[in-house]
Amino acid sequence: MQTNGRILVVQPELYATTIGVFENERFLYKQTIQHNEEELSKFTRIMDQVAYRKQTLLHQLDLDGINISKFSAVCGRGGLLQPITGGTYAVNDKMLYDLKTASYGEHVSNLGAVIADSIAKGLNIPAYIVDPPVVDEMQSIARISGIPEIERKSIFHALNHRQAGRLASKRLGKNYNELNLIVIHIARGITIGAHNKGKIIDVTNGLEGEGPFTIDRSGGIPIARFLRYGIDKFDQIEDWEQKLIKQSGLKGYLHTEDPKVIQLNLLKKDPWTMEIMQALAYQIAKEIGSMSTVLHGEVDGIVFTGNVEDDDFVMKEVITRINWIADVMVFPGNNELEAMNEGVLQVIRGEIPVKVYP
C-alpha cells in the first residue's frame, strides 16, 4: 500500500486557475494564474477553455521548476454532476461526459476534473475529485420545496464546508462526526449548511437563488413579483437566469462589485451602502437562525470560512445577531486545496475507499 504521494491539485476559478503541489501533507507550491477576461471571451463555452488552461498551468509549473513526472496523482475541483454523497471519486468516463456536456449545468468548476484527467492520462497516474459542489446528504424533509414538481437541490461549497467543519472540530478537541455545526461559506456565492454529526443535512443552494443575496446573486426573492417584473423584460430563460445570478445582489443595489469601493463607501458612512450591507448581514444571520432549528437548537459551533476578511463590517453585524446560538469560529480564506489533497491522501493510504461515479 502506498503511503506517500506528491499530488497536484487544480482549482479553476472564473478568471484564474490556482494550482498547488503537496508532498503528503506538506504544501510545497502554490500559484494562481490569472486569465485575461478578453482572452477567455474568445471561448464560446466554458469547456472550450480546457486546452488553454491546461497549457498555461503546465507552462507555469515548468517555469517554476516543478517536475511533473514526480506526481503520483492529480486532483481537480469537482463540478456540477448528479447528486452524490461526499468523498473522494476517481474521474471516469461517465463523469467526464456529464461535465463536458454540462448535463447538470455549466460552471467553471466543471473544468477541474477534465483538466486533471487530461494531465493524469499523460503521466499514467490516477485523477480524482473530492467533495464536489453537488454533494447531497440532505434529509428527505429538506428536499420538499412547496411545489411537487420541483425538489430542492444540494449545490454548495461542499469542499470548503467540510474542511471548515474539520478545522472547527480540531479546535473543539472533538471528532467532526460527533458535532453539530452551522457552517457559512462567504464568497461570490454564500452557502449556509447544517452539519449533523458529519452529514450536511440541509444547506442553502447558492447557485439557484436560495439564502442571502451576494455580490451579484439575488438570493431568495418574492417569486410572483419577479415573474411579473420579468415577463415583459426577458425573452429567453438565460435572461431570467442572468438577472438572478449575475446582475443582482450588491452589484444591483450599489452598482459595483469591487470590495475596495464598497469598503471606501462604508468608511465614508454612505447611508445607502450601510443599509444594503446591514441587509446582507441581516439575511445571513436569519439563515443561520433557520439552520439552528434544523439541528433542534443543539449547535456546538458556528463556523465562518471563505472571504470573511473582506467583510469586516458584515461579519460584526452578523455575529452580534447570532452569537447567542453558539460559539463563533472564523477560518479565513479558502482551504480547498488542502481539502482536495487530504481526500486523495486518504485514498492512497487506504484510509477510505475511492468512490465510483455515479
Swiss-Prot record:
Its EC number is 2.7.2.7. The keyword Isomerase does not apply. It catalyses: butanoate + ATP = butanoyl phosphate + ADP. GO terms for molecular function: acetate kinase activity; ATP binding; butyrate kinase activity. GO terms for biological process: acetate metabolic process. It is found in: Cytoplasm. The keyword Transit peptide does not apply. It is an enzyme of class 2 (transferase). Transmembrane segments: none annotated. It comes from the Bacteria. InterPro entries: Aliphatic_acid_kin_short-chain (IPR000890), ATPase_NBD (IPR043129), Butyrate_kin (IPR011245). Pfam families: Acetate_kinase. One of its GO terms (cellular component) is cytoplasm. Keywords: ATP-binding, Cytoplasm, Kinase, Nucleotide-binding, Transferase. Belongs to the acetokinase family. NCBIfam families: butyr_kinase, PRK03011.1-5. This is Probable butyrate kinase. It comes from Oceanobacillus iheyensis (strain DSM 14371 / CIP 107618 / JCM 11309 / KCTC 3954 / HTE831).
